[in-house]
């Protein structure tokens, strides 16, 4: 499940570090979280869609690695992001 351009732009605006930021860890985690949420909803109704399930697990792993990186680099930003997105809690 991909995000349309308007959704991506809204996520970037809400999580960017500076005005031209499109690829910081915060933005990437926010986009992955939104995609994970959409794909989880899809898998609730399509339990035999194993290809999508595998993609979901890959996205969860990537988000976990990005969050780990962010936690190592800046704990305060990590905590703010986790609270803002509503994960880990």
From Swiss-Prot:
The entry's keywords: Ribonucleoprotein, Ribosomal protein, RNA-binding, rRNA-binding
Species of the source: Prochlorococcus marinus (strain MIT 9301)
UniProt cross-references to InterPro entries, sorted A to Z: Ribosomal_uS15, Ribosomal_uS15_bac-type, uS15_NS1_RNA-bd_sf
Gene3D superfamilies attached to this UniProt entry: 6.10.250.3130, S15/NS1, RNA-binding
Region (Disordered) residue spans: 1-23
rRNA-binding as UniProt keyword: yes
Basic and acidic residues bias spans: 1-18
One Pfam family recorded for the sequence: Ribosomal_S15
GO cellular component, one term: cytosolic small ribosomal subunit
Role of this protein: One of the primary rRNA binding proteins, it binds directly to 16S rRNA where it helps nucleate assembly of the platform of the 30S subunit by binding and bridging several RNA helices of the 16S rRNA.
Name the record gives this protein: Small ribosomal subunit protein uS15
SUPFAM superfamilies assigned to the protein according to its UniProt record, in alphabetical order: S15/NS1 RNA-binding domain (SSF47060)
HAMAP family given in the database record: Ribosomal_uS15_B (MF_01343_B)
Keyword field contains S-adenosyl-L-methionine: no
Lineage summary: Bacteria, Bacillati, Cyanobacteriota, Cyanophyceae, Synechococcales
GO biological process per UniProt: translation
Gene Ontology molecular function, alphabetical: rRNA binding; structural constituent of ribosome
Quaternary structure, from the entry: Part of the 30S ribosomal subunit. Forms a bridge to the 50S subunit in the 70S ribosome, contacting the 23S rRNA.
């Amino acid at each position: 499940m991909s995000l349309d351009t308007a959704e991506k732009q809204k996520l970037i605006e809400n999580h960017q570090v500076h005005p031209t930021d499109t690829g910081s860890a915060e933005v990437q985690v926010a986009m992955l979280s939104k995609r994970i949420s959409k794909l989880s909803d899809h898998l609730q109704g399509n339990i035999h869609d194993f290809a999508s399930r595998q993609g979901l697990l890959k996205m969860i792993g990537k988000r976990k690695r990005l969050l780990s990186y962010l936690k190592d680099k800046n704990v305060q930003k990590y905590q703010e992001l986790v609270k803002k997105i509503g994960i880990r809690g």
